[in-house]
Amino acid sequence: MSTRTIETPIGLLTLQADEAAVTAIRFGADGAQDVSPLLDAAEAQLREYFAGTRRTFDLPLAPRGTAFQQRVWAALRAIPYGETRTYGELAAAIGSPSASRAVGMANHHNPIPIVIPCHRVIGANGTLTGMPAGWRLSESCWRSRGSPF
């Protein structure tokens, strides 16, 4: 595993990759600065995204999770930049219309936030809900800069 911490407009992010794919993005630092072409690409694409010059990512990803979580995370990647979906809409999109709470849990456990855009899912009442504390802080900073998700 290779790990690198980068500074971004929403705070420090730690990127993790194996030999073939990005496996995690975490809020905060672990101090590692490993050399890796894949981490170079991930860092460059994240910088472009935060600068507003990139709307999609073309990185190889390998999030670890259950088959259900994998389906949710694949559906998250299909939500276009600047758009949102409710948990119920996402549940219906994966063929499990009564599983909005389970979708919320999969969203909460997304190991590669930003690239797998869990921030584009909102509650039925239109509010951001169910996100980890670190993301909530970063999301409010991001919104204060006027950036769409």
Report residues per predicted region.
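Basic nucleic-acid-binding alpha-helical/helix-turn surface characteristic of O6-alkylguanine DNA
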Residues: 1-98, 146-149
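Terminal helix-turn-helix DNA-binding modules in bacterial transcription factors
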Residues: 109-113
